[in-house]
Amino acid sequence: MNLYRFSFAMLALLAPLAHGAAICDDTMDRTAPSARFLDHGNGTVTDQHTGLTWMRCKLGQTWNGSSCLGEPTAYYWQQGLQVAERIRSDSSHALYHFGGVSQWRLPDIKELATLVEHACYKPSLNEAIFPRAMAGDGKEVNDGYVYLMSSTVASANSQRAYLDITSGDIGFRVIGAYPDQVLLVANKP
């Protein structure tokens, strides 16, 4: 009977983690609170701290008015740059002028870093603003890592920076070695 109660208690404690909710330290001040973002109601938000406008969903996902549906597409770095260029220039692309914005691009690593919610991990992004941030490979990635691609190149053009949204850490990868997910940004109009 004690084993039964222990198992039930553990299930009750761990159940919130199974749904993909971020793990947050409630004693820390929020670094990316929802109030900082202006929701345009069209799948985009403007960060009032930086003036940057962001797509709420990663490429491959679709905004349905309240969340991101589908699975994000992972791109190799050059592909990520090319798809961003197509979105800007190809009027037949589904995301051309998405949310009324015409200059979508890959963010640099400093821009991505402004999105990190330092009080949380799994994900380290504000899930109210960027829903299903941990989506990938047909599931919510609870034990893996999710990386966002940046346009920042380092080490004599052989590596590019990425943001690990699982932890909020920044890292570098050899260009062309691994595909990453893409969240597009635009400058203040």
Model-derived features: positions:
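Bacterial N-terminal signal peptides that target proteins for export
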Residues: 1-7
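Glycine-aromatic-enriched surface loops/turns that form tight recognition elements
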Residues: 3, 19-105, 109-189
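Extended rod-forming repeat segments used as scaffolds/tethers
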Residues: 9-11, 54
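Hydrophobic h-region of N-terminal signal peptides that target proteins for export
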Residues: 11-19
